[in-house]
Amino acid sequence: MDKLTLTRFNDLIYQVLTDQGEHVGNLKLINGVWKFKAIGYAQHGEVIPGGGPLTHRHNMTFVALDEAEIGARLSMG
């Protein structure tokens, strides 16, 4: 997996992008916890919630918005 970066969408949502700019998910602040929501795209651009290359990490939680920790945990195995 490429290096992952976070891009602020608003106060409650950050997009998770690869270093190639591919959108692979969002981090959403839910009840004080950051929850990863995987995103995939079908052949014609349709969004596949919970899909994509990080589908196995869907709903992973984080206590802080730490880009290094988030990237490391999402990229594991």
Give each language-model segment a name:
Residues 14-18:
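Conserved beta-hairpin
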Residues 1-10, 37-77:
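Mixed-charge, Lys/Arg-enriched low-complexity segments
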Residues 8-9, 27-29:
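Generic beta-strand structural signal
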Residues 11-13, 31-35:
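A generic structural signal for beta-strand entry/edge sites
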Residues 3, 24-25, 32, 39:
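Intrinsically disordered, low-complexity proline/glycine-rich segments
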